[in-house]
A protein has these predicted regions:
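Flexible, substrate/cofactor-facing loop regions flanked by secondary structure
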Residues: 151-156, 163-177, 181-191, 196-200
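Internal alpha-helical transmembrane segments of multi-pass membrane proteins, especially GPCRs
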Residues: 34, 93, 178, 210-211, ...
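Membrane-interface interhelical linkers
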Residues: 1-11, 19-30, 35-67, 76-86, ...
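Hydrophobic transmembrane alpha-helices of multi-pass small-molecule transport proteins
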Residues: 39, 97, 101-105, 114-134, ...
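Hydrophobic/small/kink-forming positions within alpha-helical transmembrane segments
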Residues: 10, 14, 18, 45, ...
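Hydrophobic alpha-helical transmembrane segments in multi-pass integral membrane proteins
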Residues: 44-54, 102-117, 154-171, 219-233, ...
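C-terminal functional regions that serve as terminal interaction/effector modules
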Residues: 237-240, 246, 254, 263, ...
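Specific alpha-helical transmembrane segments that line the substrate/conduction pathway
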Residues: 9, 67-73, 80-128, 177-178, ...
Length: 303
């Protein structure tokens, strides 16, 4: 069952990232962020009964959760921007490497580093270097969005570390997610209200755009549900490892529908990044800290 939940989460997050990219390239990253987060927020209010948890009412933990929410907002904003302007096959695996940043945070805060985690961190850096120093075939690939993708990985990595260490225990899974999505929706609404709207030259009907936003939000929610249920039934290690590879789905879709073409060196760099993510997500020893892994909702989506 762990394989089922892990693959389900990876598939939904991967499809969701592609839907986010499609919407962002029509209406911009800010508006796509607003629409998707609002729809996702509504879905989590509906799902509260599925994940009951006695919530700590102390203000201190909520302030810490709000700090995590700030990193979440930055992570979402930079993810959506990277998807809007960048080559999806580049920026998706880089943005999805936040689990490596979370592992690095545990190392920095004096927890005993795991060999696999350290290897994953090294592979991530090497993969990014290979990608950014290579040239795409036919000039189709661009390095635009790579800085935003790196910023996304750092922001989500710190966010998940804060959630793992300070928030998930007293608040559970759903309450923090609702707070994070509420903060993201508020930020996006404020930004959209003050920014100038420049739609794409060719726009689909408004109903189609709403449909894309709904699908993206639904996929993000389904991915989270699959991940959380799998983790609840003690399949955490398997679910985490498989879910961490959601970027593979996005890369395949980018090649098929966006016709992105990468050079061999660039494919090698992407592969090294994905391998680093997998190494960090593999089962650890019992005394090692467990880092949270999810999507650019993630989580991403939720990203």
């Amino acid at each position: 069952m762990g394989i089922f939940y892990g693959l389900g989460a990876a598939l939904c997050w991967g499809l969701g990232d592609f839907a986010i990219t499609t919407l962002a390239r029509y209406v911009g990253s800010a508006r796509s962020l607003l629409y998707i987060q609002v729809f996702s927020l509504v879905s989590w209010f509906v799902l509260i009964p599925l994940f009951p948890h006695e919530v700590d009412t102390g203000l201190s933990v909520w302030w810490i959760a709000a700090l995590a929410g700030t990193f979440h907002v930055v992570g979402l904003a930079t993810t959506y921007r990277a998807f809007e302007i960048g080559t999806l096959s580049f920026v998706s695996p880089i943005a999805s490497s936040f689990a490596i940043v979370t592992a690095l945070m545990f190392v920095v805060t004096n927890n005993s580093p795991e060999t696999l985690s350290l290897a994953g961190i090294v592979l991530l850096v090497c993969g990014i270097v290979v990608v950014t120093r290579s040239t795409g075939s036919g000039g189709q690939a661009t390095l635009k969005g790579v800085p935003e993708a790196i910023a996304s990985a750092v922001s989500f990595g710190v966010m998940f570390w804060i959630m793992d260490v300070y928030v998930s225990g007293p608040l559970g899974d759903v309450a923090p997610l609702i707070l994070l999505k509420l903060m993201a929706s508020t930020f996006a609404a404020a930004y959209v209200a003050k920014s100038k709207y420049e739609p794409a030259p060719v726009m689909p009907p408004k109903g189609t755009l709403i449909g894309i936003a709904l699908v993206a939000a639904l996929l993000d929610t389904m991915a989270w549900v699959s991940y959380l249920i799998g983790y609840r039934f003690d399949h955490g290690a398997v679910v985490t490892a498989l879910a961490s590879l959601f970027s593979v789905v996005t890369i395949v879709l980018a090649g098929v529908f966006l016709k992105e073409r990468l050079s061999r060196n660039q494919w090698a760099g992407v592969g090294v990044v994905l391998l680093g993510i997998l190494l960090v997500s593999l089962p650890k020893s019992e005394n090692a800290p467990v880092s949270a892994v999810a999507g650019p909702d993630v989580l991403a989506e939720s990203k």
